Swiss-Prot record:
SMART domains linked to this entry: DnaJ
Domain J: from-to ranges: 12-80
Assembly, per entry: Interacts with host PPP2R1A; the interaction inhibits PP2A activity.
Subcellular location: Host cytoplasm; Host nucleus
Record has Zinc as a keyword: yes
Domains: entry comment: The common region of ST and LT proteins comprises the J domain. This domain is essential for multiple viral activities, including virion assembly, viral DNA replication, transformation and transcriptional activation. This domain is also required for cyclin A-transactivating activity of ST.
Taxonomic source organism: KI polyomavirus (isolate Stockholm 60) (KIPyV)
Protein name: Small t antigen
Record-listed N-acetylmethionine modification sites: M1
Length: 191
């Protein structure tokens, strides 16, 4: 998220969305609030035209920046080309949400065992948490710089970005964000 908007633009956007800066990076929440504020600021609905223009320009700039970060991540991962694979199932739509793909099984796959997975003791675990943690470590080894939230969707990056401790409450909010995130952003899950 540090590569998306300048600090001043981020503050402006969050003010227009009526969200606290601590929510910066919670893309599903920001999207939902953007849709609400579009209705409120729309000139045809009696809203402020200048606020609407500024909101649209900042939000579209954020979306473009996040997309370019996701595209960069896909290029860095370059393990296979999507043109080499054909899939017509719903799960293959990279714009679908993680929660929509996993459905009722999401809770079972997000983390197998709290005490084991949270500390990374089981290196063969295939829960979403452990897969994203392994992906984080791989990126760090390859690029010699720690990935940050939005470049990496692991629980560690989430906690470090928002300065949260390890707790069931922060884990709950992280898994809600992952549930509402496009599968293309959480790329390692497709492998």
């Amino acid at each position: 998220m540090d590569k998306t908007l300048s600090r001043e633009e981020a503050k402006q956007l969050m003010q227009l969305l009526c969200l606290d800066m601590s929510c910066w990076g919670n893309l599903p929440l920001m999207r939902r609030q953007y849709l609400v504020k579009c209705k409120e600021y729309h000139p045809d609905k009696g809203g402020n035209e200048e606020s609407m223009k500024l909101l649209n320009s900042l939000y579209l700039k954020l979306q473009d920046s996040v997309s370019s970060v996701h595209d960069l991540n896909e290029e860095e991962d370059n393990i296979w080309q999507s043109s080499q694979v054909y899939c017509k199932d719903l799960c293959c739509n990279k714009f679908r949400l993680v929660g929509a793909i996993y459905g009722d099984y999401y809770e079972a796959y997000i983390m197998k065992q709290w005490d084991v997975c949270i500390h990374g003791y089981n290196h063969e675990c295939q829960c979403i948490h452990c897969i994203l943690s392994k992906y984080h470590k791989e990126k760090y080894k390859i690029y010699r710089k720690p990935p940050v939230w939005i470049e990496c969707y692991c629980y560690k990056c989430y906690r470090e970005w928002f300065f949260f401790p390890i707790s069931m409450q922060t884990f709950f909010f992280w898994k809600v964000i992952i549930f509402n995130t496009e599968i293309r952003a959480v790329q390692p899950l497709l492998r």
